[in-house]
């Protein structure tokens, strides 16, 4: 999607430190990287995304089990097109270059008849603003280069009024002719083609008359800034030309219609959408539509500009493409502003994905192309009776037929059941509202506040050296935020866990961003080497501020004092994420029907690059992160998505050692397919891993004995020598790595557990969510065990780190799924309040609400509509697993119970030795 590029220098905003008071202080001594560590150079940091993948030949979409679906809204990402460098020419002999100041003096001192201003810019630019009294003369590049197309021929193709003015002025001796376009920094050896071509033709035209031809060096934009009084933005060149030639009466124009052709410009509306050779000349009582302070409308015609229809290039003059209907001042460039916001776009993307799923689930369709029919036969059209429903809604209907209503009510919340019955377009429009709210939030609230905060980089060339700045500070054990404290939402508070008034937060329609919800993007905009993508920046109020104990770096001046060092030291592209915490009224009598797991705080961040591995581990140490969820492969289609930060090495003073790796193969959903078949090919999830349907294996990849039906849970560790090589890993499996971090001359060890889901593509989804839910199960097991063994106190809020490639789409999707599963009690309470308030026209959707909250803390959480729909799929799959836990339902032939249930998956996790040893090792870190 994006590469790390240099970004323009923008003044950052620095609020009160968003780091908790008791965060771990990381100071790393200066060491040389080992052979596995990245080269610490500016060149490598800027080219960290162009490594070649050993799997570059792998297909974009693999039709294995859990095959990913890669869709970016309605279309795939567009590769940048090649744009050749603009051709420049030497300044013509007999022509001079003048500055903007000199042109300003000429306009102010010389009379108008002694000055001729020629605007050679394209008509779309000329139509917006011009230098007063300019005449627009623009030729195609082919005619500019053609020497036999002289200035006399150019005059013959202009309008009669323009011809009259130009001929009368060109007959005057000592005429000052100034040619300008939008090109800046024109020199003796570098002149733009339009200025060169027109100047050359003017110098050779009528050499008997003395004239001075000059080219504006700085271009029109700079002159507009220096002399705004000489700029006209309300008229076009027909109005700029003095009325030396009286306008012909309407009758004369109509009588000479056979010698004229319509001339496109922007003052008179077209009489009909069809081609009409009649010139409609408005009277003097025109409305305000002739006042053009913005770009002109294309549906207009100049009333007094007839041109000869015999001219071969008459149709090329003043042509302009349709301008946008609205001129939105975009303060920040992001996908929602660049892409179409119509509902049809979202529906089209959803339909394409679901059509792919239906094709994949149809075994007969995959066997041969002979089944293809166009158009579809009548029988297939009659069967398609669920056009107004999404795929997960159809699966829910089939699921509800297999279970009693009481059982479903005890597992599936009421709000989720209601969402299963609403029309497809209403659910899709929820995501459209989310995009609209984020677009409004960014365009309205993004500001850089230059007056309040100043940031001056005196020596940009010293930036790469600043990345290696180190100090030897004492590292303190991490402490965790107290969730019982009532916290006010502010720019200085990264933890969004205040007791909130929920009336205005129950639906997207009632969302209104207050001043406390304003987003600021400042820090990191200028740090291109620390950002993986050029349009993903952290919000200032929730960004993670690193604490390395560094002194202010050389060459940096701050308008405020801070103990966190400079922006080069404390910056990482990461944000804190957390849902608001609501208090349940004491006299409230409702009881929740679903279980609730431990709440956590998330750190959403981009995948590390070679230049940011040290910052990545510093973030983990500062916040006491025990668990990292990695949702991306290291390479996709030959493009690096994540640097292998788990490789052993010395990363600027932080030593990384890979202790152990487990490969968790996902169980098959073949038996699930049989048990969830309803009517007409409607399985709950039919795409699964082929092989054993009852085993959840934990091994390395050479174990292919999957035909037995025993529950053999072998805990086979991959050797340390093989840990660095992931080429043979099964992409459908979950990888668990135990990593040891040491720092300060190996005096302070810190263990970290990484869970990696490799088969989730960028900007895409999975056909089978079992690997996502199993990763969440591992997370829950670790957090619950740490609480049970008193690693955390009951009032502490653990922090986990989640990353994909950009830290937005897949990261936001998983954080939303986990937050819904962890906050059933809160959402059931909010639903009851929603019913009390009686919002008949509004929809209570905790999923959309959660995404909206997260998008106020980090940009573009859940990037596209298919990831949004995938969240509902995952929740339905979770409820399906829970239903199997509480029922004794058997297969249709009365055989054994389906072994794939939530309890079966959790049981396999509890037997993993790597998790048990990790918790034991974490408890040993407490005395530090």
Swiss-Prot record:
It is found in: Cytoplasm. Pfam families: Rhodanese, Y_phosphatase. The modification Phosphoserine is found at residues 248, 297, 368. GO terms for cellular component: cytoplasm; nucleus. InterPro entries: Prot-tyrosine_phosphatase-like, Protein-Tyr_Phosphatase, PTP_cat, Rhodanese-like_dom, Rhodanese-like_dom_sf, Tyr_Pase_AS, Tyr_Pase_cat, Tyr_Pase_dom. Its EC number is 3.1.3.48. Residues 247-307, 467-487, 672-713 are annotated as: Disordered. It comes from the Eukaryota. Residues 249-259, 265-275, 672-691 have a biased composition (Polar residues). GO terms for biological process: cellular hyperosmotic response; fungal-type cell wall organization or biogenesis; negative regulation of cell integrity MAPK cascade; pheromone response MAPK cascade; regulation of sporulation; signal transduction. Residues 290-307, 692-713 have a biased composition (Low complexity). Residues 502-878 form the Tyrosine-protein phosphatase domain. Residues 280-289 have a biased composition (Basic and acidic residues). Residues 111-232 form the Rhodanese domain. The modification Phosphothreonine is found at residue 75. GO terms for molecular function: protein sequestering activity; protein tyrosine phosphatase activity. The active site is at residue 804. Present with 768 molecules/cell in log phase SD medium. This is Tyrosine-protein phosphatase 3. It comes from Saccharomyces cerevisiae (strain ATCC 204508 / S288c) (Baker's yeast). The lineage of its organism: Eukaryota, Fungi, Dikarya, Ascomycota, Saccharomycotina. The gene is PTP3.
